[in-house]
Amino acid sequence: KVFLMSDAVVAALPNQKDASGKTMQGMLDELVAAGVQVKLCQTCAWARGIGELPLIAGCSLGTLAGLAQDVLQADKVITL
């Protein structure tokens, strides 16, 4: 599972690119195709005005309560 927070939520908008020109959509599409659940912090998305914008297929809004539940159930958590 991947949970995007703060400014990282914009990565789930279509056609976002990094400094090298590689699309974030391509990376997220690969994760989704591999069965990875990709969620965005709903509060962070709304704070940045993107809560109602279309997201990359397979990405969805999630809650902090949902994140807390995932963390409690996980064997390992990696934070970047």
Model-flagged regions — what are they?
Residues 1-6, 38-42:
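Short internal beta-strands
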Residues 11-13, 47-50:
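Short active-site-adjacent structural elements
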Residues 18-47:
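A glycine-rich helix N-cap at a beta->alpha junction
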Residues 1, 18, 49-52:
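A broad "ordered helical/assembly scaffold" signature
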Residues 3, 8-22:
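N-terminal beta-loop-helix "entrance" segment that forms/cooperates
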Residues 48-80:
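C-terminal structural segments of small proteins and small subunits
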